[in-house]
Structures are given as C-alpha cells and as structure tokens.
C-alpha cells in the first residue's frame, strides 16, 4: 500500500490511521452560544475558558488581524421535532486576546416562523478559542417541501476580520415528509404508478388539502372563491322565478287575481320594466365579482409556481439514479404540461363543480316546489355519473398513461436529434432516423385516437339522458298542464330547467372526468417528488468531515497550528473497479497539505480521474475514507468544457444573469482574467463588454425604482394563462463554435479562478496546449497557490485561506511547480513523491 510521508509529526500521522470520532462538546468545545428566544438575548453570553483552542504564531499579526468565518459554507439539519441546527464559526490567527462577531438568520427558500425561528446574537471568542457554535431552532410540520434553506450571516466584527467568502453560510433543512401526504408512504416504497392509481382518489384529496393548507395565499382565496360563486347561483335561481312570474302573473291578463300580485298593482307595464331591470342590474355585481376574481383571486399561478419551484429544486438534488429515472423530456412535460393540467383539473375545477352543484340545488328547489314529479332526473343523473366513473376510471388512466408515453417518446426523439444532428449527418443516418421518427408518430397517433374515441363516447352520456327526460316530460304535457297539476309558466320553465339541468350535469360529469384525468399527472409527479436525493449523503459526508476536522484540532491542541494546516487525507481508500486503487494494489493512503500543488501522473485509463472524483465527493469509495475539512470549498473542473448556451462570455465565466449581482469590480477582475489567459480577442472582449453593459444598465434601472422581477420566467399575462402559448425557440448562440478547443478550456479555467475555490481539482489542464500557453496556465496555478487566489484585491493575502491545486497529467510529464507527484499505475497502485521546493 502506497503511503505518503510529508514530514508531519508522528503523532499526527498516527492520528489519521483511524476514522476520527466526534469528541464530545464538553471535552473540546466551550458551551454553545445558542439561539434563545428574543427575550433571552445572546449578546450577553460569555464563553467559558474550556473552549476549543489552537494557536498560530507568525502567520498573522496579533489581535484584530485574526480572521473569523463559518466552519462550512453549508450545514445540514433534519426537520424533526425539536431539531436544532448547529452552526459553527471558527477563528483563525494568533488567537491572542478576545474578539467577537455578530450573527443573524435571514430567509432564503425557508421562511422564518414557518421552517425555523428567527435568531441573532453575538459570538464571543476568548483568548485561545478557535471554534464556537450557535443553534437555530427548526420548526417541524407534516407538509411536504423539497429541501429548503435559510442563511446565517456574520457582521460587525470586533477585534477581528470577517472573511468575505466565509461571512455567509446556508443551512439546509432536510424534509422527510412525502408529497402530497405522509399517508402514502407504503405505496411509494415500491415506486409503482399502478399502486398509486389504486388510491388515486385518496391521493387527489390529499393534493387538494396540500394546496389549500400549504401553498401560500390559497386557503383564503379558496374560501373567497367558494363564497363568490354563490352570487351567480342566487342570480340563477332568481331568473327562474322571474320567468315563471312573467308568464303566470305579468302576461296573464285573463286572471283578475293577478292584478294584486303585480309589483306595481294594476300596472303591468311598470312591473315588466321592473322585471327587466331585475334581470339586468345584478349582472353589474356579477361583473365586479368576476373582475375581482380575475385580478385578485387568480390561484393557478400560485400553485403552479409552488409545484414548479419545488420540483426544480428537487431535481437539482437528485441522485444519479433518480436523474436516470426522469429523462429530460419527462421533466419538461411535467413542468409545462402535467403541472398546469393538475392545477387546472385537480384543484381549480372544484370551484366550477361547486358552482354547478349550487345551480343544481337551485333547480332542485324549483322543481320540488313547483312540480315534485319532475324532479326524478335529479336522482337519476348522479347515480348514472357515479356508476359511469366507477367503471371507466381504470380504462381512462391506462389510455392516458399510454398516450403520455407516446408523447414522451416523440419529445425525447426530437431532443436527441437536437444533440446528435451533426453525428447523424456525418454518418448518413438521416433516412433511418426519419423512418424511426415516422414510426413513433404513427404510434402516438394511434394512442391519441384511442383516447379521443373513449372521450367521444364519454361526452354522449348526459345529452342523451337529457334528451330522453325532456321528451318524456313533453309527452305528459296534456296531463300535467290541462289537468291543473302545474301552471303553463311552470311547465315551460321546467322544460328550460331540464335543459339547464342536463347542461349542469354535463359540466359536473366533465368536472369529475377532469378530476379523474388529473390523477394520472398527479401520480407521475408524486413519484418524481419521492425519488431519492443526494442531500442525506451530502449531510453524512459533512458530518464525517466535521468530525475529522474537530478531531484533528483536538489532537493538535497547543501545537501552534491553525485550521489552515488541516490536510486533505486519503485513508485506506479503495475503489473496486479502479485500476490503481483496488484491493490488489493496496488502495491509497496520502495527505495533501493545504497550500500545495499536487500532480497526479499516470497513463490513460489508469484511474487518475477517480482520485479527483473521490476528492470532490462525486464518487463514494468502496472502502476507506476521504477526509476534508468542511471549511474548504472544492471545485472539480472536468476536461470537457461546460457552457451555458443561453448567455455569453460574461454570464459564463461569472455564472450570473441577474443585474443585482453585477459590480464594476466583478467586470474588471473578469477582464483581467481573460487577458491573463490569452482570451482577449476583439470579438470576445466586445461580447464581454456588451453583456456587462446590459447588466449595468439593468442594475441602474433597478436603482431608479424599476426592479426586474427575479421570477420573470414564471410570470403570466393578464389572463393568468400562458400555458397554451407556443414556446419561443431559444436563440442560437454561435459564439461557442467560434472558440477553439484551447479557448474553450481556458474560458472554463477563467471561470474556476474567478470563483476562487480553496481546492482546485483539474483533469488534464495542460495536456493539449502548446508550450507557451502551458507555461501561462502553470504560472497561474503557481500564483493561485502562493498568493492564495488569483487577481484578488478585496482582501489582504494574510487574511486569505490557503489555495491548493491538484491536477492530472500523462505518465511522463514533469512540472517544476508541483510540490508532490502522485504516480498512478495499474500494476503498483499509487506512489507519492515529494519534489524539491518549488521556484517562486
């Protein structure tokens, strides 16, 4: 087994031969500064002398030059009852004398009062203390959320300096609740859509309750909608009686008794005018109600926005297995079709059904009051609808699932064509691809027609029942009217009511059919929301790293060292399929000191990239541990350049498109980086300047009170429905094709330098460059390490954390800048060579 000796004391090497355990807080940490309720202010908390302490003399000046930052940029906590997020803050420097820093929480995707309790306070470091902690109380609920987070910020330092890159951390709340309800945990264990179909109506009820209870503003808007729908029903009932009154009283001049029943006794003309006004004027109230509903109570956007954001956030945290289970075309269909369909047919439809049921109640009241015998269809319609839905439920969902699969296949083929168009043309496969696409389209057409045929016969049920009911009632006209069982006005009104009743029950059937249709996208979304995410694995990794760093500090207490001296440790690491780190070659055990340059040299396919993947948590080891202090930010830069096609040079190297993030310093540093890496061609600079100018102008507009919405991509037009609009094609960006292979790589490297990670891991960064460019890149690596960052002017070098570069090369390549060379060989595993001190 290859091991590395970097000159550390024996006690330190031995300390890393075992998996570090977290020491008890009572043994190494002073009592935590806890986020108590506001009435118990934290500002007066005084740490005890038993705090965790390490010292470092000579690297920083005493007193106010000590640096304070968060122990990690990300902390994790489970959303369980009485959970508290523990957030650690570290002090780096001489540790001489006291210092303090204020802290506070701030909303991000998680909101105070809903997911956590707002807290703030002051952290006091005593002489020799290097690690302190605060706690934030997490609020547990039974409602599903994808992983939400909030911020904790440091500010107002006293006798110390806050590292700008470590002044803010994210606390991720791991929600273990299930969408849309925890009641379906058993069905989701098998990840079967068929099992969800069996409980589809229960799932739909849970979704409705989820929207009502959990989506912001929906509860009060829903109640308002239900109440306002009753206005229309009241008007509808009034119009029925107006028509009966008009025929039986106002127009019945043969019956003298009607004179006394006129609104204006003895004046039929005035009464008729009053009836006309009674028919017209309430519509102004209904118009105002409709306007208020459209302007203030539009709920579709709120629910769609909530579901889309949660699914988007969930997808970003998917494991590789989960990503493979949800192809990109399925995600697109879920976002742009399934969610709008679910919201429209699975929640908003209930208000239409509520209004229709109200009208049916009005009709029932009229029928039972005027002619009870005519109310028989009131009982026939619901019975037939329930039986029909019961017997067609499964068939409908099966047809919808097949039609959805056909649509997914068509969309997926088009998306694959977009990616592989050049390859298809180069190898003359266009004919085969077109034939295959035609076959997919024919299959989709067949599936669509099956569903349409089914829906056609669905739509015939209520109209035919209504036709029969009216015909039978008309055949009884002579007996009903002439024998005095009802008046002519009531009889004619009942004929109209029968037609209205059929229309209402047709709407009810369509509504319940829509509800049953919504179960299909709901089941699909439920499965996507339940897929595994990598946040728990990242949380476990963070705990191991935190335990390692705290254990290392405990072992090294009093040795005049700081967190800058915590190495990166590969401890008996084996990967079964790795050519160089399997059980036969003995795995890898090595220490990588911060502030060093490490070259991983070896032939092709020897496993060099696996080392970088292990380092950056992209790959779990089969055995052993990779231990890294959590305060280190690691960035793995792949050999294949990655770009965002929707933005240009500026957006790609700074990874921003929001004007609020733009600053002149950002522009200047990016420009210097492009010049250093020989990326200063006129057209590149012109594009860079053009993007920067647009962002600067947008920022100026924001400063003048015209802020651009951060959620512009989700905004809709005035009618609240942009789902049916044709999607705009993304504008093609040919600038990427103008870059050479070398320029693409250097642009990616510029992005990495600008984001200034503590550990920069690169795959073959100089492999395909000429000698001149190779030296440019290597000199940048060297300055990045020695100056603790490249082209950074906002913080003195003494206040920056060390930078480390680990890069892979061919087996025979040798570079003087490397402090250590890890030689990778399938036959001998990994051997470590210490190089002579690098030339600065």
Give names to the regions the model predicted.
Residues 21, 26, 30, 43-46, ...:
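Membrane-integrated ABC transporters
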Residues 230, 351-400, 475-486:
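Transmembrane helices of ABC transporter permease
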Residues 316-360, 419-422:
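Juxtamembrane loop-to-helix connectors within ABC transporter transmembrane domains
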Residues 309, 650-734, 778-782, 786-787:
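ABC ATPase nucleotide-binding domain helical subdomain, centered on the C-loop/LSGGQ "ABC signature"
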Residues 1-208:
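Short boundary segments that mark the start of a structured unit
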Residues 593, 597, 601-668, 672, ...:
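ABC ATPase nucleotide-binding domain signature region
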Residues 402, 406, 410, 422-429, ...:
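Cytosolic ends of transmembrane helices, especially the final helix of ABC transmembrane type-1 domains
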Residues 256-260, 366-380, 450-523, 624:
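Helix-loop-helix
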């Amino acid at each position: 087994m290859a091991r590395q000796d970097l000159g550390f004391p024996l006690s330190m090497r031995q300390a890393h031969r075992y998996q570090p355990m977290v020491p008890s807080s009572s043994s190494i940490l002073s009592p935590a500064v806890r986020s108590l309720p506001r009435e118990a202010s934290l500002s007066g908390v005084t740490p005890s002398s038993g705090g965790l302490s390490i010292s470092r003399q000579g690297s920083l000046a005493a007193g106010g030059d000590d640096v304070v930052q968060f122990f990690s940029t990300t902390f994790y906590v489970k959303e369980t009852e009485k959970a508290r997020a523990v957030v650690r803050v570290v002090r780096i420097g001489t540790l001489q004398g006291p210092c303090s820093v204020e802290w506070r929480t701030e909303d991000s995707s998680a909101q105070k009062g809903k997911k956590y309790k707002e807290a703030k306070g002051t952290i006091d470091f005593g002489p020799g203390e290097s690690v302190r902690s605060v706690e934030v109380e997490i609020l547990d609920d039974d409602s599903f959320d994808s992983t939400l987070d909030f911020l904790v910020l440091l500010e107002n330092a006293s006798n110390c300096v806050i590292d700008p890159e470590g002044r803010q951390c994210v606390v991720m709340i791991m929600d273990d609740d299930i969408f849309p309800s925890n009641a379906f945990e058993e069905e989701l264990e098998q990840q079967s859509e068929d099992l969800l179909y069996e409980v589809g109506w229960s799932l739909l009820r849970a979704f409705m309750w989820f929207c009502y209870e959990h989506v912001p503003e929906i509860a009060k808007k829903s109640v308002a909608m239900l109440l306002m729908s009753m206005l229309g029903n009241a008007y509808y009932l009034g119009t029925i009686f107006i028509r009966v009154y008009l025929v039986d009283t106002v127009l019945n001049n043969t019956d003298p008794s009607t004179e006394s029943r006129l609104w204006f006794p003895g004046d039929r003309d005035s009464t008729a005018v009053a009836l006309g006004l009674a028919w017209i004027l309430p519509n102004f109230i209904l118009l105002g109600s409709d306007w208020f509903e459209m302007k203030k109570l539009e709920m579709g956007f709120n629910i769609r926005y909530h579901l889309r954001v949660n699914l988007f956030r969930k997808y970003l945290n998917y494991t590789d297995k989960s990503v493979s289970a949800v192809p990109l075309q399925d995600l697109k269909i879920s976002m742009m079709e399934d969610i709008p369909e679910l919201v429209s047919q699975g929640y908003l439809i209930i208000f239409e059904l509520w209004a229709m049921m109200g009208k049916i109640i009005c009709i029932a009241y009229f029928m039972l009051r005027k002619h009870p015998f005519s109310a028989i269809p009131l009982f026939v319609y619901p019975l037939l609808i329930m039986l029909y839905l019961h017997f067609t439920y499964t068939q409908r969902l099966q047809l919808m699932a097949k039609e959805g699969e056909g649509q997914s296949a068509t969309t997926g083929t088009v998306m694959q064509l977009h990616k592989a168009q050049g390859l298809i043309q180069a190898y003359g496969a266009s004919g085969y691809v077109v034939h295959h696409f035609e076959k997919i389209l024919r299959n989709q057409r067949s599936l669509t027609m099956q569903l349409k045929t089914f829906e056609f016969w669905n739509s015939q049920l209520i109209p035919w029942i209504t036709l029969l009911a009216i015909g039978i009632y008309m055949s009884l006209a002579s007996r009903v009217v002439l024998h005095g069982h009802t008046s002519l006005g009531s009889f004619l009104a009942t004929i109209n009511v029968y037609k209205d009743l059929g229309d209402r029950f047709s709407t009810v059937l369509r509504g319940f059919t829509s509800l049953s249709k919504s179960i299909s996208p709901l089941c699909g979304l439920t499965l996507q929301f339940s897929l595994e995410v990598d946040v728990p694995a990242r949380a476990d990794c963070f705990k191991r790293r935190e335990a390692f760093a705290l254990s290392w500090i405990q072992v090294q207490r009093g040795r005049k060292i700081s967190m800058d001296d915590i190495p990166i440790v590969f401890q008996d690491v084996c990967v079964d399929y790795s050519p160089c780190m399997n059980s036969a070659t003995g795995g890898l055990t090595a220490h990588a000191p911060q502030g060093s340059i490490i070259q991983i040299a070896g032939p092709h396919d020897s496993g060099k990239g696996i080392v970088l993947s292990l380092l950056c948590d992209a790959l779990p080891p089969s055995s052993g541990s990779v231990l890294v202090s959590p305060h280190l930010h690691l960035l793995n830069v792949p050999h294949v350049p990655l770009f965002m096609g929707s933005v240009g040079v500026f957006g790609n190297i700074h990874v921003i498109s929001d004007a609020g993030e733009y600053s002149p310093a950002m522009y200047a540093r990016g420009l210097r980086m492009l010049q250093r890496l020989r990326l200063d061609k006129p057209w590149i600079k012109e594009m860079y300047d053009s993007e920067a100018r647009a962002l600067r102008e947008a920022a100026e507009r924001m400063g003048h009170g015209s802020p651009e919405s951060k959620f512009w991509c989700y905004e809709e037009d005035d009618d609240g429905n942009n789902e049916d609009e044709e999607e705009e094609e993304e504008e093609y960006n040919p600038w990427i094709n103008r870059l050479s292979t070398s320029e693409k790589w250097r642009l990616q490297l510029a992005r990495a330098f600008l984001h200034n990670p503590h550990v920069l891991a690169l795959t073959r960064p100089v492999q395909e460059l000429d000698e001149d460019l190779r030296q440019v890149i290597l000199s940048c690596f060297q300055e990045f390490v020695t100056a603790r960052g490249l082209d950074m002017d906002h913080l003195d070098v003494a206040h920056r954390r060390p930078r480390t570069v680990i890069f892979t090369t061919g087996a025979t390549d040798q570079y003087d800048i490397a402090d250590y060379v890890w030689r990778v060989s399938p036959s001998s595993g990994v051997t470590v060579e210490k190089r002579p001190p690098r030339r600065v």
